[in-house]
């Protein structure tokens, strides 16, 4: 499972012009599920997302986690993040989980996040989404389980 996290001052996801998820300060995370992923993969990614130290402390060092600052978590499914881009000029999606597995594990991740963190929002799995964000930094990390 991959999570491309971006520290944001705010972010929102729209589907057909309707806002379906938004957060203020926090993390926007694009999530890709791969064929061998399990609920344990999702739990490991969630632990990292909530505890990865990407927010600045009083001295300006990245020493604070999402949990420490009480920021929002916006999860957006993005199967293209799992693409194989090693050869050719067209990405292959054979390294992405089938849609049924992807949706099941994304929903599991979202459910667990809502149990463990205060402010959690999401996009809509499989939908054509427009993602709006104000990057903070920018600070971006690719986390893999």
UniProtKB/Swiss-Prot annotation:
Catalytic activity: glycyl-tRNA(Ala) + H2O = tRNA(Ala) + glycine + H(+); a D-aminoacyl-tRNA + H2O = a tRNA + a D-alpha-amino acid + H(+)
Cell location: Cytoplasm
GO molecular function, one term: Ser(Gly)-tRNA(Ala) hydrolase activity
Motif (Gly-cisPro motif, important for rejection of L-amino acids): 137-138
Record's keyword annotation contains Glycoprotein: no
Keyword vocabulary terms for this entry: Cytoplasm, Hydrolase, RNA-binding, tRNA-binding
A GO BP annotation: D-amino acid catabolic process
Cellular component aspect of the GO annotation: cytoplasm
EC number: 3.1.1.96
Pfam families in UniProt: Tyr_Deacylase
EC category: hydrolase
HAMAP family referenced in this protein's UniProt entry, alphabetically: Deacylase_Dtd (MF_00518)
NCBIfam families referenced in this protein's UniProt entry, alphabetically: D-aminoacyl-tRNA deacylase (TIGR00256)
Subunit structure: Homodimer.
Functional description taken from the UniProt entry: An aminoacyl-tRNA editing enzyme that deacylates mischarged D-aminoacyl-tRNAs. Also deacylates mischarged glycyl-tRNA(Ala), protecting cells against glycine mischarging by AlaRS. Acts via tRNA-based rather than protein-based catalysis; rejects L-amino acids rather than detecting D-amino acids in the active site. By recycling D-aminoacyl-tRNA to D-amino acids and free tRNA molecules, this enzyme counteracts the toxicity associated with the formation of D-aminoacyl-tRNA entities in vivo and helps enforce protein L-homochirality.
Record comment regarding domains: A Gly-cisPro motif from one monomer fits into the active site of the other monomer to allow specific chiral rejection of L-amino acids.
Recorded family membership: Belongs to the DTD family.
Protein name (record): D-aminoacyl-tRNA deacylase
